[in-house]
Structure formats: structure tokens, C-alpha cells
Regions:
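Short beta-strand/loop element within the Bergerat-fold HATPase_c
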Residues: 38-48
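Conserved short strand/loop->alpha-helix "switch" segment adjacent to the catalytic nucleotide/phosphoryl-transfer site
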Residues: 2-20, 77
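Glycine-rich ATP-binding loops of the HATPase_c
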Residues: 94-104
Length: 115
């Protein structure tokens, strides 16, 4: 399910957006679960703010530890970098991310200033 629109006439670089979308969708594809699995992508722009919300069904439990981002359960040097890469790009645009879990889904919200 998608209601995503690329914002026109902004300073948002297409490569930066691809880093966000690639990492977020990889996370979703690796973790989507449940009886009726789904991934949902939506976005909107209000003035200079561009918001992206990505949801996926998830029957597990995220472990946040001491961070506001969940700990990875994978091994290897590159694993666990996806959300950090998304956050790095969002902060380049004076924004940030949040991750929530509830009702058997995970919700990733990304906010950026694009003007």
C-alpha cells in the first residue's frame, strides 16, 4: 500500500531519499510478519516539512536497550546500520526519525526540512 509522493521544488536530493527508502524497505522486507503481512508507505509535505511514514506488520518484539533505536540481532559489520543511515540523512535536513511498536506493527516516521 502506498501513498508516497516525491516533493517537488525542494532541496531534497534524490540520492539522499534513496538511502532512506532503501534502508527502510530492506528493514521492512526482513521483518514483515503476521497472518496478513503488509508494508505501507505514505508521505506529505506541509510548508517546509516533509514527512514519510513507513509501517509494517510485525509480531515480534523490538529491543530498544539504552537507545531510541532497536538493537540489531544480526551479526557482521554492516548489519544494524540501516536506521542509523536513515537518521544521518534526516539530520542532514535538520530532521530526525522515530520508531514505534504497537498493535503488531512497527511505525517508522521520518521528518525533514526540505526548504
Amino acid at each position: 500500500l502506498s501513498d508516497f509522493h516525491y516533493p517537488q521544488n525542494t532541496k531534497l536530493n534524490a540520492f539522499d531519499l534513496s538511502v532512506i527508502m532503501n534502508n527502510a524497505l530492506n528493514n521492512c522486507m526482513e521483518n514483515v510478519s503476521g497472518d496478513d503481512p503488509y508494508i505501507s508507505i505514505s508521505s506529505f509535505r506541509k510548508n517546509s516539512i516533509f514527512m514519510i511514514t513507513i509501517k509494517n506488520s510485525f509480531g515480534g518484539q523490538l529491543n530498544f536497550g539504552d537507545s531510541d533505536l532497536p538493537e540489531t540481532t544480526k551479526s557482521g559489520r554492516e548489519h544494524g546500520m540501516g536506521l542509523n543511515n536513515i537518521r544521518r540523512v534526516a539530520r542532514m535536513y535538520m530532521g530526525d526519525i522515530s520508531l514505534e511498536q504497537g498493535n503488531e506493527e512497527v511505525i517508522l516516521s521520518i521528518m525533514m526540512q526540505v526548504e
